[in-house]
Amino acid sequence: MPKGSPELTAARKEEIVNACEKLYQTMSFKDITLKEIGKVTTFTRTSIYNYFQTKEEIFLALYEREYDRWNLELVSILEENEVLSDKELADKIAVSIEHRAQLLKLLSMNNYDMEKNSRPELLVSFKKAYGASLTNVKRLLKKFRPDMSEQDIRNFIYIFFPFMFGIYPYTSVTDKQKAAMEAAGVDYVYQSIYELTYSCLMMLLRIQQL
């Protein structure tokens, strides 16, 4: 790591992550390289190595930032509401997920590569952000569904978070994929991120009432 203030180091890392995010809007994960990232920053590829050893570490930092932003929304739901019905709680969580399409894309398509090819200390930092999202959803359930037991909450978590892996591929379908589904005679109803997430949340909340 080059010498400099913590603020300067953080700013440089942020610039690199922002460049990666910009490329990810139009390029696939496999096509994005440190060289390509360097083209949209003030850094050379060699300079980037001062902050990240692999492109996967840059993506992991982007992934962590997505969880941080989702956590802010979850905390705001917790702090800005005193009482929420099941429908209201499901709606607010679904909206927060709808805002994090990039998180869902990384989760479903690139999670393994990012974790495998990143240094342990960076993976630990990411896991803290991920762990905070688990904690925040638990806090929401404890506040707005006080009837749910610890086991109920645990069941909810271990269904909903794995479910999140499938949201992006089920809602971000290309024209080519749609044409193939139609040609194959597959009867499929396309849903938005919000619709799919809301339906799952409502089902889980209702199950816990039985």
What are these regions (language model features)?
Residues 61, 75-103, 156-160:
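Hydrophobic alpha-helical connector segments
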Residues 135-147, 163-210:
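C-terminal peripheral helix-coil segments that are non-catalytic and often amphipathic
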Residues 145, 149-157:
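Membrane-interface starts of transmembrane alpha-helices
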Residues 11, 15-22, 40, 57-77, ...:
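Alpha-helical structural segments
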